[in-house]
Amino acid sequence: MSKRTSAKYKLDRRMGENIWGRPKSPVNKREYGPGQHGQRRKGKMSDYGIQLKAKQKLKGYYGDVTEKQFKRNYTEASRMKGDTSQNLIGLLERRLDAVVYRAKFAPTIFAARQLVSHGHIRVNGVKCNIASRQVKPGDEISLGSKAQEMALVLEAQGLSERDVPEYIAQDGGAKVTFVRVPTLDEVPYPVKMEPNLVVEFYSR
């Protein structure tokens, strides 16, 4: 198991949930945290602890984005009109690596980020290697010609545990269009996400 894969499943164990809905997640077999003390009964969490866990889970789901990037997203969301928690989800779903993952161009969010950083993704026909780039409604996201034959891309397209959401329109197997910014209810999270608690965490 690679270091990144091991770290990914460690996050699952720490959260006690199958964050990405993967069949091989260790929490499908056990429901306690990593390490030798993982089976100890956990005490009641404080409000701060609950908020922190919600933040770690959401941040981890999107490939463990840096705290600097994540807080920047929160700050931008808080300045936008409307509900801050919904705005935050919209900004996270507009990340280029997130759209690549949702389009089933990659089997994991980490692989999606690699595809972007290695120059295999096009936005409106132009190569883009910035995973955090904000995609806009109407933008076309496509795979480069070499990427279309990659094993990980073919693996992702064959995955049955997740579907391409309605806010992303498919155009063949190598191109999608980002139709609209989704609401929280539209995002196909395998586990419950609570962005309202993330807002409370940063509003302390």
Curated annotation (Swiss-Prot):
Sorted UniProt keywords: Ribonucleoprotein, Ribosomal protein, RNA-binding, rRNA-binding
Region called Disordered, residue ranges: 13-46
Gene Ontology MF term list: rRNA binding; structural constituent of ribosome
GO biological process, one term: translation
Organism superkingdom: Bacteria
Record GO cellular component, one term: small ribosomal subunit
S4 RNA-binding domain ranges (all copies): 94-157
SMART domains linked to this entry: Ribosomal_S4, S4
Signal peptide: none
Subunit structure: Part of the 30S ribosomal subunit. Contacts protein S5. The interaction surface between S4 and S5 is involved in control of translational fidelity.
Function: One of the primary rRNA binding proteins, it binds directly to 16S rRNA where it nucleates assembly of the body of the 30S subunit.
Record-stated family: Belongs to the universal ribosomal protein uS4 family.
NCBIfam families: PRK05327.1, rpsD_bact
PANTHER family the UniProt entry points to: 30S 40S RIBOSOMAL PROTEIN, SMALL RIBOSOMAL SUBUNIT PROTEIN US4M
Protein name: Small ribosomal subunit protein uS4
